[in-house]
């Protein structure tokens, strides 16, 4: 349908729409990077990572140690909470769907809390989801560690209808970049979407998402 001209699409939704010739990427969101202690860095990045968290006292020292353990995952459409962790653990010899017990979670915060409560042995979440539960779980950074970080995952897109003319695309690009620079506009995109800025993007930035989606389908 041609009702929507512009959309904020996460990576997987964008690749599906693009491959059906329905959407083209216009811009990619920038967010603050993450320091080792989980705090925001001053640097803006156009991608982020997924992390596998375990308790420090769990005795889990390597990916291989995850076999037979319980892992908290998000819905199958989640890039950071499902797709990327599954593929990267599989590369290291652990097929999550066969070698582990999967516990489905609604929300990355819930996954971290389940790990803290001992309901699961590991949690696949975005880096660093621990900071969103720190208020309720003040010891989260002391008691957990990152077992593995994935390859970078592209941030959300601003995508447009694939038949939109280039002049209008350029106007939209400028408009979104300008909005991000105004005080009021920045406040909205930061509070609603956790976006800080927008940069030009191209379709090939999302090839890794296609590759990983394909690999997950082959794993089942």
Locations of the language-model features?
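Hydrophobic residues within well-ordered alpha-helices
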Residues: 1, 66, 115-116, 172
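Extracytoplasmic
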Residues: 1-4, 9-12, 21, 47-49, ...
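Short beta-strand-to-loop elements that line the ligand-binding cleft
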Residues: 3-8, 98-107, 145-148
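A ligand-binding cleft/hinge motif common to bilobed small-molecule-binding domains
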Residues: 11-22, 85-91, 116, 121-142
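Bilobed "Venus flytrap"/periplasmic-binding protein-like clamshell domains
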Residues: 12, 30, 41-113
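Short beta-strand->loop
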Residues: 23-45, 101, 134-152
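A bilobed periplasmic-binding-protein/Venus flytrap-type ligand-binding module shared by bacterial periplasmic
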Residues: 49-60, 153-166
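An extracytoplasmic/periplasmic, membrane-proximal ligand-sensing/linker region
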Residues: 160-220
């Amino acid at each position: 349908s041609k009702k929507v001209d512009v959309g904020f699409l996460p990576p997987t939704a964008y690749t599906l729409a693009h491959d059906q010739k329905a959407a083209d990427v216009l811009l990619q969101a920038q967010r603050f990077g993450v320091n080792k202690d989980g705090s925001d860095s001053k640097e803006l990045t156009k991608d982020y990572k997924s992390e596998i968290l375990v308790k420090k006292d769990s005795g889990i020292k390597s990916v291989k140690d995850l076999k037979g353990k319980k892992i908290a995952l998000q819905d199958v459409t989640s890039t950071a909470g499902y797709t990327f962790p599954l593929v990267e653990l599989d590369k290291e010899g652990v097929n999550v769907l066969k070698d582990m017990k999967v516990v489905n979670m609604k929300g990355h915060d819930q996954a971290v809390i389940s790990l803290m409560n001992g309901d699961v042995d590991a949690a696949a979440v975005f880096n660093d989801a621990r900071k969103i539960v720190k208020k309720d779980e003040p010891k989260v950074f002391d008691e957990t560690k990152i077992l593995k970080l994935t390859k970078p995952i592209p941030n959300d897109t601003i995508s447009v209808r694939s038949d939109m003319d280039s002049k209008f695309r350029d106007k939209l690009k400028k408009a979104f970049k300008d909005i991000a620079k105004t005080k009021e506009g920045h406040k909205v995109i930061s509070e609603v979407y956790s976006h800080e800025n927008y940069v030009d993007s191209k379709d090939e930035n999302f090839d890794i998402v296609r590759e990983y989606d394909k690999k997950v389908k082959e794993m089942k």
